[in-house]
Each structure stands twice: as C-alpha cells, then as structure tokens.
Amino acid sequence: EEAVHGLYHRRLVDKELDEHFGGRLREFYLGRQVDLPDGNSLPFDQFWHLHWRVNGRLHTLSLHDALLRARQLLAPTPAQAMAAVTAHGDDHTGNLLYNPDGSRDGAISYFDPAFAGNHIPALLAPCKSLYHICYAHPNMLYDPDELRIELSVSIDDGVLQIDHDWQLTPLRQQFLTSQINHVWEPLLRTLKQKGMLPTTWRDTICAALLCCPLLCKNLLAGAGRPNPLTADASILV
C-alpha cells in the first residue's frame, strides 16, 4: 500500500475498511464547536450538514456528504482499476529546493519523500502541489492575523451563505495556469487516450483537494500554534 494514502484516506478513518469516520477527522473536528466570523457558534455535527453557497454559487454536497464521497473514492483499494505513476506525492514548494548553481535538469531538488512511491494513483499525485502552491495562501493557514479580506456569513434554512472578495494573487494565478497547462491537461489527455480515465475523475480530484487543507491541520477558529486561526481564515481556507 502506497504511503500517499496517509495524506488522504488514512486521515479519514482509523482502519482501511472502516465504514465510520476516525483519524484526523475525528481528532480535529468531531464533537467540537465551530465559531463563525459573525460571532455565532454551532456544533460541528450540525455544521457539516449545512450546504454552502459561496459568492452566489450553491455547492450540491454538504461537507458531511463530500467527506463520505472522499472516504469511498480515495480508498487504497478503489472500486475500479486506476492508473498509477512514480511520484513524490507531496511536492508543494515547501518540499522543493532551488539550487542556482545546478544544471538545468538539476536546479530543483525534492526532499521529504515521506509520501513518495512507485504506484501512486495518477489522479492523486499532483493534488497536494495544486492545493498548496496555488490555493493555500500562507495568510490563511499560518499568518491569519495578516489576512485582509471582506467576508460575511449567515445561515438560512440549512444553507451557509458566504460572500468574500478573496482572489488568487497574480503569482498564484500563474502557478495555477502552469499546473493546468503542464501537469493536468497532459495527464488527463494521456489517461483518456489510454482508456484509463475513470468516470469519477472530477469527483476524485475534488475529494483529494478537500482533504488537503481539512486534514492537514485543524482548521477550527482558535486552533493552531503559534498563530491560532481566526474565524475568517477558518471559513475561507
């Protein structure tokens, strides 16, 4: 079993075949209280059943249902055969070293290969770098007091309404464009050509991207050291 599953499925459960949640999900969230930016608070057991409408766009799955789907799709033994690759598995910029004196092919080096492997599911291999390089701004996860954002939240009839003005910085937009052009489009095209692109590929990628922040660290307001998350950072990330 590849170590990369330790970033995803193993953080959702205690044992591989469990049909209930455990792992980091239970440690971080289950039975806890969620403090919202508007000053209200509610149990996580209620919070994760809310549907989200973000800047007018309604998400079809609640957090609970999205995690149920993730537990199924990210299982180490998938329901259908899946293409695999040799990859680092956790190659965000924090795990890359740039050597300005190196050759063109050796200027960038990977380190911390804790989740590397020879048979990593191809759709999972680039997900950590996609999230952490493009979407996870450090002011969300690590320096929340420096986060500058206009954000409002409200709950109405089971829907969590969130409006915000956050946008990707120009640099992170360039990272995203580069990843799409040089990683994701070639990968998806190759898998499709070889008849190895599962019908659930979009859901699988979305499930992995959900786990990247949610199971990386406790995202509840007040959690985290040395800089506890603010309620704004908690809901935005």
Feature-to-residue mapping (PLM):
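Hydrophobic transmembrane helix bundles of membrane-integrated enzymes that assemble
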Residues: 66-68, 96, 208-210
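Active-site-proximal structural scaffolding
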Residues: 80, 84, 89, 119-127
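Active-site activation/catalytic loop segments of kinase-like enzymes and analogous catalytic loops
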Residues: 100, 108, 120-191, 209-225
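Helical subdomain adjoining the active site within ATP-dependent kinase catalytic cores
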Residues: 17-40, 167-237
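ATP-dependent phospho-/nucleotidyl transfer catalytic cores
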Residues: 5-88, 101-104
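Conserved catalytic-loop position in the HRD/HxD motif
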Residues: 90, 95
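Activation of the activation-loop gatekeeper triad in protein kinase-fold domains
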Residues: 110-117
